[in-house]
Regions:
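Acidic, Ser/Thr/Pro-rich regulatory low-complexity segments at or just upstream of the first helical elements
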Residues: 1-79, 90-99, 163-210
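Short alpha-helical scaffolding segments that buttress acidic/His motifs in well-ordered protein cores
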Residues: 67-70, 84, 150
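Short helix-interrupting loop/turn segments at helix-coil junctions
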Residues: 77-81, 118-126, 158
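Contiguous, well-ordered alpha-helical segments that form the cores/surfaces of helical PPI scaffolds
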Residues: 82-90, 108-120
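Short conserved catalytic/interaction loops centered on acidic-Pro-aromatic/His motifs
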Residues: 100-103, 121-136
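Channel- or pocket-lining gating/hinge segments that regulate access to a cavity or pore
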Residues: 130-173, 179
Length: 210
């Protein structure tokens, strides 16, 4: 649990929490990988287009910058980002039949919606949907629709057991350690989410999207 405490510590006024940097690193890498996969298999591009989370054009802001913006303005506890990570995993595992994937077209909307859901479940005080829509750069109508779609997507399964929270913290901590250490030639990438909440760890991770 010590690594969880270290991971979710609040940084200074100008410092992005470590958990934000870790989650941004994972999702940015997954989006890039899925972009490459979609480019290699053009026949698979049409399937995800129907998702409410998939924008018609790529946002002009990077995943890391977008996460930093959310962290700066959302005013939520760092633990919310771990919970948002859990929610994203649940959504994507359930959404495989709908070909929902994390790529450059969907990652931003998935992030802002996952954080919104986590904040409402975790924090006693939080901003409303109109505020989060402004932070995320989308309309209030879109924010409301994405929230409902997200909740149905996870089956309203919002509770996160302490053991599950710790497991996802461990994955995020591993991401930080890999980012800080000189990478070996063939290092394993921690860019996957676990297949099972209870027992999620680096060795039990599963791809965010096929």
């Amino acid at each position: 649990m010590a690594e969880c405490e270290e991971l979710v510590e609040s940084g200074g006024a100008e410092e992005v929490p470590r958990v934000v940097a870790a989650l941004a690193g994972i999702l940015e890498r997954v989006a890039e990988r899925n972009d490459a996969a979609a480019a290699a298999e053009l026949s698979a591009v049409a399937a995800p287009a129907a998702s409410a989370f998939r924008a018609t054009t790529k946002p002009g802001i990077s995943v890391r910058a977008y996460m930093a913006r959310i962290a700066r303005f959302a005013g939520c506890s760092p633990a919310c980002y771990v919970v948002a990570y859990v929610y994203l995993d649940r959504l994507l595992r359930r959404g495989r039949r709908l070909a929902l994937a994390v790529d450059s077209y969907s990652v931003h909307r998935l992030l802002i919606t996952a954080v919104l859901a986590a904040v409402k479940f975790m924090d006693d005080i939080c901003y409303n949907n109109a505020y989060f829509a402004k932070v995320g750069g989308i309309s209030l109508v879109e924010m409301n629709y994405l929230e409902v779609d997200f909740l149905f997507g996870v089956g309203f399964d919002l509770n996160v057991a302490p053991e599950t929270f710790a497991d996802y913290c461990a994955v995020l901590q591993s991401e930080l350690l890999c980012a800080e250490a000189p990478p070996p030639p063939l290092r394993l990438q921690h860019c996957c989410l676990s297949d099972d909440d209870a027992g999620a760890g680096c060795s039990a991770q599963q791809q965010l999207a096929a």
